[in-house]
Regions:
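An amphipathic alpha-helical interaction surface
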Residues: 64-190
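Membrane-proximal alpha-helical anchors
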Residues: 1-68
């Protein structure tokens, strides 16, 4: 009788251990799925913000809200993907700066007496930029992190921004603010 009780106890222990292991495995899968769903939502929100810039005329209505939504969606995606996507923050910031540059270009070139064809022609840089940004976002979302591609895209957006500023005789965009410093060990805390 003691042997039977011992065997049943051992079997119960094995079943309980196996059940716990399976429950933990399923919980990890569910957590990973939830993380993927949250990241997918951020990708979609950014794509929506980009799509709202295609066909948009900043000479007809303010561009501020659309650029703010774009910046917020970019920030959320960078924060959600974290350190696994090194370089994404730099690329998205350079793209945002390029979008602001094209928005300014469109607004400065617009005239109240523009024909439809002229207006559409002046919108091309902003629309084309938004279309290409959307394509690059879809590519990266489907392929996954690609450090060399992100570096190349960052360099391209930065050089395009500087080129437009130079062509228009504008000052280059600021890349930093001397009044803002990152918090680190050398920064005095109060």
């Amino acid at each position: 009788m003691d042997v039977a009780a011992f065997v049943i106890s051992c079997l119960s222990l094995v079943v309980a251990g196996l059940g716990t292991w399976l429950a933990n495995a399923r919980a990890k899968e569910a957590l990973e799925e939830a993380r993927r769903a949250a990241a997918d939502a951020c990708w979609s929100k950014l794509q929506e913000a980009v799509q709202r810039l295609i066909g948009f005329d900043p000479a007809a209505e303010p561009i501020n809200d659309r650029l703010t939504n774009l910046r917020i969606a970019m920030t959320e995606l960078v924060e959600k993907l974290g350190d696994e996507w090194k370089g994404l923050d730099l690329w998205l910031d350079s793209e945002r700066t390029l979008g602001v540059t094209f928005g300014r270009l469109v607004m400065e070139q617009a005239r109240s007496d523009d024909s439809i064809d002229r207006r559409l022609k002046s919108l091309e840089p902003l629309m084309f930029w938004a279309q290409v940004l959307g394509q690059n976002l879809r590519y990266l979302r489907s392929k996954g992190h690609d450090g060399p591609a992100l570096s190349e895209l960052t360099e391209h957006a930065t050089s395009m921004t500087l080129s437009v500023h130079e062509q228009q005789g504008w000052e280059p965009p600021r890349t930093s603010n001397p009044r803002v410093r990152p918090l680190d060990e050398d920064f005095p805390r109060s």
